């Protein structure tokens, strides 16, 4: 049996530096670059930097960029190496923060928001493939949870760091985010491990992926569609839909951020102890119920509890899906290929869902509950795909 340096056990003290670098990358590229934009939207409009329509358009630029980055990540790493590509993408995100401090034009902003999204997609494809080969097999789930904890920290930070920065003005806010991104880029710079030499003789290059992998692609796509409404409309639902006001909406968003911090590590822990497939089934069932209850809940305690549960899902499902890829595809090189395709599937449905839910929200006269029920249906469909009759359907959806 051929062996690879990717399978060698690293000393415990050396494991945490790459994991920390991965956490910094997910925090900068997704946690801050995407989620810190949400609380900036009202300020961008009130300061007359851009119109309301332009602000939504600029937000979509990041999602489109994420899809492009997911497609370009592996070719970029092939030319630059994983480590250099990750470093470059973190520099790009940092530059985007600084550039957004200057409202030159809508085109200027769109270009930088697009670039930050491209960097986020590329990092999401490459970060686990760079770090996890240096982690013992029994701890890969927990390690991937720690890496993607950065997304949760960014969601939480969007509700705690941005408001104080906004008191200094929009330019200072963007510059502050850029300074934080620059610091995290510097701290992670020497934490990235050297690329491992992959030996792929254990699997033929043209060997087809197992059918269960395409099933996972379909599941991951519908998970993406299911997480969008709460991620985008939760605060508006509480503040305007329920008439509770912006303050209560902000408090519920903080609880969502708390869930986002808890999610990655706890879901990774589940993957290590229950296996990825059972964990995905459990998580999807809980999420479908929580989203259904969100559509009919009105008390603060219920909303806060549901926000924690639902908030754990966007960053938490990443290590679970990655663990499932590792269960289904033993060869390290093919794991990278499968994860890249899964990320593209996720990014595509997330972008499409974002536009579709926005259109439906406008067409329904701002009916938040309808969006949450549809998202619960998407999560339930993802769960159904994991059963025999669903597996046949999923292979028809995404198999080339």
PLM features: residue spans?
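Extracytoplasmic gate region of multi-pass secondary transporters
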Residues: 38, 213-254, 261-264
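Helix-breaking motifs and short loop linkers at transmembrane-helix boundaries and internal kinks
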Residues: 49, 81, 102-108, 243, ...
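Paired small-residue
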Residues: 107-116, 301-309
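Cytoplasmic helix-loop-helix junction between adjacent transmembrane helices
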Residues: 112-150
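Intracellular juxtamembrane helix-capping segments at the cytosolic ends
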Residues: 122-135, 316-330
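Helix-loop-helix hairpin linking two adjacent transmembrane segments in secondary transporters
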Residues: 137-138, 145-192
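A membrane-interface helix-boundary motif in multi-pass transporters
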Residues: 164-179, 359-379
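A late C-terminal transmembrane helix in Major Facilitator Superfamily
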Residues: 332-364
């Amino acid at each position: 049996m051929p062996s690879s340096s990717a399978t060698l056990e690293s000393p415990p003290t050396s494991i945490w530096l790459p994991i920390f670098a991965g956490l910094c990358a997910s925090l900068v590229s997704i946690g801050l670059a995407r989620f810190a934009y949400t609380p900036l939207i009202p300020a961008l409009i009130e300061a007359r930097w851009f119109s309301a329509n332009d602000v939504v358009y600029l937000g979509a630029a990041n999602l489109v960029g994420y899809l492009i980055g997911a497609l370009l990540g592996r070719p970029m790493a092939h030319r630059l190496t994983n480590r250099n590509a990750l470093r470059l993408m973190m520099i790009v995100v940092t530059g985007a923060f600084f550039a957004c401090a200057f409202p030159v034009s809508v085109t200027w902003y769109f270009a930088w928001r697009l670039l930050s999204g491209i960097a986020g997609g590329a990092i999401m494809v490459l970060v686990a493939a760079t770090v996890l080969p240096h982690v013992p097999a029994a701890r890969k789930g927990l390690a991937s949870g720690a890496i993607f904890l950065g997304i949760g920290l960014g969601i939480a930070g969007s509700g705690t760091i941005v408001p104080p920065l906004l008191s200094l003005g929009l330019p200072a806010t963007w510059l502050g985010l850029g300074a934080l991104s620059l610091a995290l880029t510097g701290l992670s710079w020497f934490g990235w491990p050297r690329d491992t030499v992959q030996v792929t003789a254990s699997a033929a290059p043209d060997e087809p992926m197992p059918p269960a992998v395409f099933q996972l692609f379909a599941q991951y796509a519908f998970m993406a569609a299911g997480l969008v409404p709460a991620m985008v409309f939760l605060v508006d639902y509480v503040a305007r839909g329920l008439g509770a006001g912006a303050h209560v909406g902000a408090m519920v968003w903080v609880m969502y951020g708390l869930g986002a911090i808890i999610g990655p590590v706890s879901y990774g822990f589940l993957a290590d102890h229950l296996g990825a497939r059972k964990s995905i089934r459990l998580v999807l069932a809980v999420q479908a119920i929580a989203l259904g209850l969100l559509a009919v809940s009105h008390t603060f305690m219920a909303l806060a509890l549901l926000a924690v549960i639902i908030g754990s899902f966007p960053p938490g499902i990443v290590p679970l899906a990655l663990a499932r890829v590792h269960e289904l595809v033993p060869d390290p090189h093919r794991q990278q290929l499968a994860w890249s395709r899964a990320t593209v599937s996720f990014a595509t449905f997330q972008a499409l869902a974002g536009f579709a839910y926005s259109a439906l929200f406008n067409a329904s006269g701002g009916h938040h509950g309808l969006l949450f029920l549809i998202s619960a249906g998407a999560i339930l469909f993802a769960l159904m795909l994991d059963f025999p009759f669903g597996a046949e359907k999923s292979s028809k959806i995404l198999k080339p």
